[in-house]
Structure formats: structure tokens, C-alpha cells
Amino acid sequence: MGEWTILERLLEAAVQQHSTMIGRILLTVVVIFRILIVAIVGETVYDDEQTMFVCNTLQPGCNQACYDRAFPISHIRYWVFQIIMVCTPSLCFITYSVHQSAKQRERRYSTVFLALDRDPPESMGGPGGTGGGGSGGGKREDKKLQNAIVNGVLQNTENTSKETEPDCLEVKELTPHPSGLRTASRSKLRRQEGISRFYIIQVVFRNALEIGFLVGQYFLYGFSVPGLYECDRYPCIKEVECYVSRPTEKTVFLVFMFAVSGICVVLNLAELNHLGWRKIKLAVRGAQAKRKSVYEIRNKDLPRVSVPNFGRTQSSDSAYV
């Protein structure tokens, strides 16, 4: 159960910031109607699945062969595999969004550090300084006039008094350069577009996986679990009858998981509709146009440079004939 709790927390982290309302409803369906039911109810229902699968024969290996024929993969294992695969696109989106947020944070910190980076004050006791203090007097004056930058504002320390404060020292606020603001806003917009595009891609992949597992479940098990299964697989000598434990309960469970998968498919389609098919098409076309423009720029014919001809003379040409 601890592994499922970790998966639930990761999915909640993916939904809190970037998902739509439909995505949050989908998370509730996945967490409550899939993870909790499979982890709590499924283990008790399918705990004795193979041991209680009994055939009316004493032929060694016949029970195992017929069980493998009836259930190529156990219901509970199939649903666990389905949950893991369906949640994989969301986990990939978490990794991508966290990586982009970390890059944006590092870029912001580097910009702030560059803005706050200043040279140390020059010594006050140079050759043109007042009376014989030399470098020692300059250092003492520097200590008195030490300044601190707090929240982008140049301020005096407590050791500095009004008598020692020079007239040229002013309190100034660091204002960002307009070009830096444009660059930061452009990079933030590009990051948001990348996250939105990746979110749409993971919704599409998640829906494709849901449909694939739904079709696979139908072809493997159908809509019911029979109580009596007839088998003539080797090493059974003749056709034998095998009995499945709790067939009605497993049928209800199977239909319930069909319904949950269908609801997830509908919610994924509704989320894509909410995001806007037109926006999705424009995003895809924009990415294709960008790649095409880069390709055209790379393959653009460069201006031909005339190169002097250092070919062979008439006599040398005739020598090679």
C-alpha cells in the first residue's frame, strides 16, 4: 500500500499547478476507483484465484495448463500494469515541469546576482586624501562607509553616522533594464508554452493508452467470468471441466473496471475539448512551421564565391589524354 501512496502523491503534485478542472476530476477517478479498489478489494478477491481453480482430473499439469488458457494474465496484474502505464505520461509531465521550474529559478537568481554585483569601494586615503592616513586611514573610512543592498536598495549600515556620510552617497533602487524585462518575459512565455504543449501531449498519450488497455481487456476476458470452463489443452488427456472461484464477484469487478476505463476515456476527450482542438492544431502547426523555417535557413544557398581557376594548361591537359 505504501507504493500506491507514493504514486498518489506524485499524481497530486502533477495536478495542483497545471491541470484543468477536468484533469483533477480524472485524478480523483484514478486514485479512488482504481488504485484504492485494486489495492484493497482486488487482493482479497483474487488472492486464491489459482489455488481454487479446480479441474475434474488428476492428470499432472492439467490444472496449470487450463488456468493459463483461461486467464493468460491475471485480472489484478493486468489492472496494476494498466495503472502504471496510464500514469507514466503524467509522471513524465511532472519531471518536465519540475525541470523547467528549476531552470527558470536558476535563471532568475543569476539575473538578480548580476544586478546586485558591485565593485568594492575605493580607498579613501590615497595620495590625494586628507592628511597622512595612507592606506590604513582609507580602510578605516571604508569600514565606516560600508553599504548593504537589501531588496535591491542601497542602504547604510549601523556604523555609519550622518557626519561621516558623504554627499555623493545616495539611496538608489536598482531598476531592471527594459531589455532584461523583455528577455525575462519572453523566456517565461516560452516556458509556459512548452509546459502547455507537453501537457496536451501527455493527455493524448494517456487517452491512447486507456483505449488500448480497454480493447485489450475486452479481447482477453470479455464482459463476464464463466463459472465453468471447458479445457482440452495438453497435457489433459480429454476435455475436462474446470471451476472458477467466485465468478459472479469477479464479473462485477470486471464490469466495474470496464466502466472506470470508459469514464477515463470520456474525461480525457472532454479535457482535450476543454483545452481546445483548434489551439492544439495551432500548437502542432506552429511547431511544424518552426522546424520548417529552421530547416530552410540551414539549407539556404550561400552566395557563391568566385574561385580563381588554377587548372592545367593546354600542354598539361594534352599530356593526360
From Swiss-Prot:
Gly residues bias: start-end ranges: 125-137
Membrane topology, Cytoplasmic segments: 1-19, 99-197, 276-321
UniProt protein name: Gap junction delta-2 protein
Gene3D superfamilies to which the protein is assigned, alphabetical: Gap junction channel protein cysteine-rich domain
Chief subcellular site?
membrane
- Membrane-spanning regions, if any? 20-42, 76-98, 198-220, 253-275
One GO process term, biological-process aspect: chemical synaptic transmission
| Gene Ontology cellular-component annotations | connexin complex; synapse
Recorded hits in PROSITE patterns, A to Z, give: CONNEXINS_1 (PS00407), CONNEXINS_2 (PS00408)
Q: Which gene encodes it?
A: GJD2
Extracellular topological segments: 43-75, 221-252
Q: Which organism is it from?
A: Bos taurus
